[in-house]
Amino acid sequence: MSNIRDIAKEAGVSVTTVSRVINHHPYVTEEKRNKVMQAMKTLNYIPNHLAVNLSRGKSRIIAVVFPWITNPYYLRILEGAIKQASSHHYHIIVIETHYNEDEEIKALEMLKHRSIDGIIFITKQLSIETICDYEEYGPIVLMEKNDHLPYIFINQYEAMKKALNHLMSEDYKKIGYTVHRNNGFSANERTKAYATLPEDMQYKQFIYVSGLSLTEGKQLAQRILKQMNLPDALIVTNDAHCAGLYAEFQNQGIKVPEDIALISYENGELSQVNNITIIDLPLLQMGERSVELILSDSATSEELPSKLIIRKST
């Protein structure tokens, strides 16, 4: 029995396009719609009865899924998504998951039952294979590069290389970095970049698994200062975490950058106030483009650039 992937292959289009045709989505070119309809006829495909019935109406709601609503990094992406959705007369709902797979499944079930028209995963715990099981019910966008679903992607490997190259150019030798999840996509890419350093500059003891908040940054600083051997530079996951490190180092008499240099990812208000060197990530644009991917059949997956901005912390 044919399925939605077979139709996509036969028609030479994406699974998302097939889903949009089945669900009478307006943002599909006539050429692609005809290809899909012909493929369905050739393969004798009968669309899922539930999906067809529910597609007669649109909720005009897009869900944005991420772990913590208090994190400025995610909120900046959300801001871009809300702005773009509003311009198309769509609404955004937030689904906070705390990296709980059951909560992510609930969001996908909302798509299946047509409570929402699409899902944007800023980050996720579920496997891509599990998420793909739901793509026939509507568009799903990820923020990591993959071979199965549309994505908006920042090359974390290249971003990390920019930070490392800058620190090496400033003659820092003992470079460390922080990650939130060892198995996360961004963490894996940064680890690959770190592994390109000369072997005598790689320090496993300077790779810190920590949180994302300002408070957790302070706690990490306290952990670091208990070590006998200290890094002379740190690349930090986000601005809030970096602000916590910076504040606690200052409290303990550790000078930035004289004793420890800091680089952060993001470029929000906290890094600007503290004059932190940053890898500027186009978070607002990520949110905007992810909504475009949900709504427009002509939009394609995209890699967005990062930029090094040097300030006084290195």
Predicted segments with their positions:
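Periplasmic-binding protein-like
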Residues: 108, 116-122, 176-179, 207-208, ...
